[in-house]
A protein has these predicted regions:
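Loop-helix junctions at membrane interfaces
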Residues: 1-186
């Protein structure tokens, strides 16, 4: 019994460390504002969650966020880190709610549900909470935060949807390719 708990905690630690390393290598998408970055760490969270369950996925997200803060710090007054954590939850948790049959088609449906959730939640969270909060804390005018077009709604549709759709597709595809190989060691 104790051996199983130690093994479970060790696996969470390994997945958290791998997710942290991938989170440190985030990259911006050139036409988007520089603070919108893609990292592939959610693919590790998905794999860890599928191997160990939704509680483990939640712990991996929390540990990854804390470790990234310790190693990298923050340049967005913790708002970017909060956004990354909340959006990771919105992407990963629908995968566990769907409970499609464990086939490739089922996995694609689950990841599709996660991508849909990520895109919708990111739009709502950015438009109503994160950007206004960042604008207020950083004393930056709301209009200057996003500079793609004059229409703020189009900017959000352009930047937030493109970024999160790309992130969801990349992370989901990476998780699908790696997941089968990881299950051999589970």
């Amino acid at each position: 019994m104790l051996h199983n708990k130690i093994l479970y905690i060790s696996r969470i630690a390994i997945f958290s460390a791998a997710a942290t390393v991938l989170a440190l290598f985030s990259f911006p998408i050139p036409p988007l504002p520089s603070f919108y970055k893609v990292n592939l760490s959610d693919s590790i969270v998905i794999i860890g969650g599928l191997a160990l369950g939704p509680l483990a996925a939640s712990l991996i997200i929390f540990i990854r966020t804390a470790l990234v803060l310790l190693v990298k710090g923050t340049s967005t007054f913790f708002i970017g880190n909060l956004a990354d954590m909340l959006l990771s939850f919105s992407f990963v948790m629908p995968i566990f709610v769907c409970k499609c049959n464990r086939t490739l088609r089922g996995a694609v449906k689950e990841i599709g549900a996660g991508i849909f959730s990520l895109c919708i939640f990111s739009l709502v969270l950015n438009y109503f909470v994160l950007v206004p909060l960042y604008s207020k804390i950083a004393s930056v005018p709301y209009n200057e935060i996003l500079t793609c077009n004059n229409n703020l709604l189009i900017q959000f549709l352009c930047a937030v949807l493109l970024l999160n759709l790309l992130k969801g597709i990349l992370c989901g595809t990476l998780a699908l390719f790696i997941h089968r190989r990881v299950l051999k060691f589970h």
